[in-house]
């Protein structure tokens, strides 16, 4: 293994899944949301722009289209136009129903926007972080 080329130089590992990897390239520049699995969670989306509509997509967690309607459609993406805002009450809290831990990506679903940096992570922990930043 010592003479094995680095992971990013292998032909089979040159796709988007590696180019977005915090393990290989460090965390993305935008702020990373952090929570513990099961924490109650709300995300406030505010589009302060004046030109383009975006499609906010959160992988894994879901919320109700109409917050106060228990019969409302459950979704994981929403279009947001200039000067709009939404509060997403995440069902079952951080980690969602299945208790997902680790990094959950959220991004604009319009690929040029995603590719140009309109994405970040929601990091969900399963154990207490002491703030030192050390990896196990």
Regions found by a protein language model. Name each.
Residues 1-136:
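Copper-binding active sites and cupredoxin-like electron-transfer domains
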């Amino acid at each position: 293994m010592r003479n094995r080329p680095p992971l990013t130089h292998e032909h089979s590992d040159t796709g988007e899944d590696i180019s977005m990897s915090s393990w290989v390239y460090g965390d993305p520049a935008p702020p990373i949301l952090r929570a513990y699995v099961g924490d109650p969670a709300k995300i406030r989306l505010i589009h302060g722009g004046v030109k383009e509509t975006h499609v906010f997509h959160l992988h894994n967690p879901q919320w109700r289209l109409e917050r106060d309607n228990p019969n409302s459609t459950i979704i994981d993406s929403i279009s947001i136009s200039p000067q709009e805002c939404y509060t997403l009450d995440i069902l079952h809290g951080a980690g969602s129903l299945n208790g997902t831990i680790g990094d959950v990506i959220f991004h604009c679903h319009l690929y040029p926007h995603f590719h140009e940096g309109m994405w970040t992570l929601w990091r969900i922990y399963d154990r207490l972080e002491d703030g030192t930043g050390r990896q196990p």
